[in-house]
């Protein structure tokens, strides 16, 4: 009998399974798709391209939360050498991305007066406890002390760092928490060599030492008796276990158990989670279109880009070059094809403005609509204090992990963090 069953093989599920297996626990990972990775999955196609479900960076690189999981496993993520050539798109132009307070003081992005206001804002952020501002927006935080139209127009950049560019929507506490960690770490993001494939290969190796990964096997029911988990039922088998970690999006939990067993607050939260969506396009060219090795973020348009082949030739066959561009779709995107077409037109218009020779050089492209990009938009209502804890109240042995629960950080970091939190609780509460 396994010590734990993990439902879902994304960042959270695979990390938790690896940590538990590393500690000597027997685990079974259930994944309904044909490969591990969830929203960070990747594969090499028949032509030799490494395809990813979007491009995934890791905040704070070797000092970040993802690498903390690996350190616990006695490993390190193999990050590409840090590059300082990141760019911003603002007002239809490409700008050098400022690095640290000195960089923002010198940037021609803003007037001298606006730069000084922005530095004062950063100083205030460094002194502020995020806990005081989780329930207010970034715009609220800014307007409590400052008034400058240039800086206000630049605020989406701060929100975009945690993938919620609207300053009137994003939680100030979440932005403050992230920026304080960036300022302390002195590093922005890290790109793993070979993309996310290497991340999951390492996690799989640790799981295989004392556990199993079952692909194409969908969990149908979490078995609960007297408010205590006793196992998981799939279409193939029943897996008795004293611990179940649900590592899929929290809204899906209702499909696997009697909702009346959930605390009312958890049930309500799960039903009302707001996620983000995006359009991602992989562009292939026969020649380099830029030497940029780092990434690009949009300030006044919610766009981002990576030029993988500039830094890591393993992504493509010889003589081919890959770059991935993404643009956020409107909030509450409902699948409307005309909205996607409009977003694609906007993306390509921006590309043409900042790289006039780029699109004419494209020989192939792959479009993907990420219906769920970030499972949890970091609004005040969905900020860290308001998300459900990893340990389900009222159901012994049930844990929630992933980017929709109370982990630290943002996006994938929440998944890695929640996996560590759950593993710590399980290992401290249940001795072999």
Residue ranges with predicted function:
Residues 2-29:
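N-terminal Rossmann-like FAD-binding beta1-loop-alpha1 element of flavoenzymes
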Residues 275-373:
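C-terminal segments that line or cap access tunnels to active or ligand-binding sites in enzymes
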Residues 41-50, 59-117:
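A conserved beta-strand/loop capping segment in the N-terminal third of enzymes
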Residues 84-95, 101-177:
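Rossmann-like flavin
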